[in-house]
């Protein structure tokens, strides 16, 4: 089921295994969530995974897992697994939790197929984006 983008909200993400994250659940119960921690605690892993959960509606950015989790000699990412729990608001205004959407890499490719991801615009702003903007402003 593909849901209209403005009616879907991420409520929870569960990392079974992704990089250094193992059996970690993050709940998104408020409109704004801060991802904080010491260096190496997995903040960037969380942000990269969040950027890959959705299909854009045509205006957003289309991030895919290999963009951030590139296979290399040290890590193929095989065995990685996470789940996202989304909520939709029905036409009657009643919120409904959707079944968890599982994302994983069993062998050589990530699943599920990208076209089956829920629709929601995502804009990833990394440190490189911020630095390039600052350089452009100062010129």
Annotate the PLM regions.
Residues 29, 45-102:
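Conserved P-loop NTP-binding catalytic core
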Residues 18, 31, 87-91, 128-130:
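Generic structural motif
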Residues 8, 21, 79-81, 120:
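A general secondary-structure signal for short beta-strands and their flanking turns/coil
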Residues 114-132:
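Extended, charged alpha-helical "arm/stalk" segments used for dimerization and assembly
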Residues 1-16, 92-117:
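A short, basic N-terminal segment
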């Amino acid at each position: 089921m593909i849901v209209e983008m403005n009616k879907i909200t991420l409520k929870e993400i569960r990392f079974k295994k992704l990089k250094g994250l193992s059996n970690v659940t993050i709940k998104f119960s408020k409109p704004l969530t801060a991802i904080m921690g010491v260096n190496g605690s997995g903040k960037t892993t969380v942000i990269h995974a969040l950027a890959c959960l959705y299909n854009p509606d045509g205006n957003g950015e289309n991030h895919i897992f290999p963009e951030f989790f590139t296979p290399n000699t040290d890590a193929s990412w095989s065995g990685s697994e996470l789940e996202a729990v989304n909520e939709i608001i029905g036409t009657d205004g009643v919120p409904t939790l959707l079944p968890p959407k599982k994302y994983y890499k069993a062998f050589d490719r990530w699943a599920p197929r990208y076209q089956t991801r829920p629709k929601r615009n995502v804009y990833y702003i990394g440190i490189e984006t911020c630095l390039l903007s600052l350089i452009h402003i100062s010129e």
